UniProtKB/Swiss-Prot annotation:
Keywords: Acetylation, Oxidoreductase, Phosphoprotein. The modification Phosphoserine is found at S217. GO terms for cellular component: lipid droplet; mitochondrion; plasma membrane. The keyword Phosphoprotein applies. Signal peptide: none annotated. It holds the Pfam family Sacchrp_dh_NADP. One of its GO terms (molecular function) is oxidoreductase activity. Gene3D superfamilies: NAD(P)-binding Rossmann-like Domain (3.40.50.720). One of its GO terms (biological process) is glycolipid biosynthetic process. Coiled coil: none annotated. The modification N-acetylalanine is found at A2. This is Saccharopine dehydrogenase-like oxidoreductase.
Amino acid sequence: MATEQRPFHLVVFGASGFTGQFVTEEVAREQVDPERSSRLPWAVAGRSREKLQRVLEKAALKLGRPTLSSEVGIIICDIANPASLDEMAKQATVVPNCVGPYRFYGEPVIKACIENGASCIDISGEPQFLELMQLKYHEKAADKGVYIIGSSGFDSIPADLGVIYTRNKMNGTLTAVESFLTIHSGPEGLSIHDGTWKSAIYGFGDQSNLRKLRNASNLKPVPLVGPKLKRRWPISYCRELKGYSIPFMGSDVSVVRRTQRYLYENLEESPVQYAAYATVGGITSVIKLMFAGLFFLFFVRFGIGRQLLIKFPWFFSFGYFSKQGPTQKQIDAASFTLTFFGQGYSQGIGTDKNKPNIKICTQVKGPEAGYVATPIAMVQAAMTLLNDASHLPKAGGVFTPGAAFSKTKLIDRLNKHGIEFSVISSSEV
């Protein structure tokens, strides 16, 4: 991507927010990466100069770089002020947008970026927002030659690129994949900032509009290759992982399906069926999550119920979500494993009448998901936009990570930065 006309290659919008501060630290690390062959001019953006300055000072102290504050630009802008967003976008090649919930605050940033020739990356896990933005802005972004790429954090780069990695490693045709997410915690347990909780509340409370949006898009069904992937029960036992699992409620399924549609329609690649699950351990954890899920699904249906869920996240999530977010000790001790079980056909075997005769197991492993892996994924996606333009879709547009980055070296970048892709096993049946 052309960067020479703009003062900043990256502008981190929402840098003083809970997730934004971690993204800021990650860009600061990337700035001094010994493998960098060129300088990385960048800035932070938000409503308060004081807060932005404090974030830079905190990052400088943590990274041992006392001059960091003087090396990074500061841009004052506000979601409520479109002119200020325009000024920010004019100065950036890529805007990593950390301001959510995106259903409320994401569209003005996308609009400003498209109108002013900047690309934009977000870390939304909200299917309605992601799908609506593609419907509304894909052609406009393509006309401007800019890239708008959603869900470029833990939701949903590991899942989306994990399916592509699995397909690339199979010696044949991959037809179906199930993924199982396992979150590992240390002795102090897990905690997630309530911004993620709020996004889930608004998303579940607005399921009817998501269905209307999908019905209005009038998309033709993607061909079914191989046997139809059977859905598991809401609570099922995974023999391979020796634990119970539930359907994963994030954006992964929506994102992966959109990617597979793009790869089929634009690159003539065989579409892969996909289902996502999360492991929950033993029966005690299952019972605890059942109660939490029932509470959530009951209260999220009503306006006053949603207000209570938002006001008391720790209580209704059984301690998983809080307004304070995780401590540094909790972050340092946490990690994730995303395991993929795929099936398909060896070369020369027809997919219409025969049963799948190849199985493959792959994994994506990484550090704490929300505030370590997400910034790594977001920043490396941004660096891929800047440095691997020849392997991006030729025209701009609104893309999923897999659609945008399937031909790039993003997986190699992630491997070098601690999000590791590997093959566990592969065999003919």
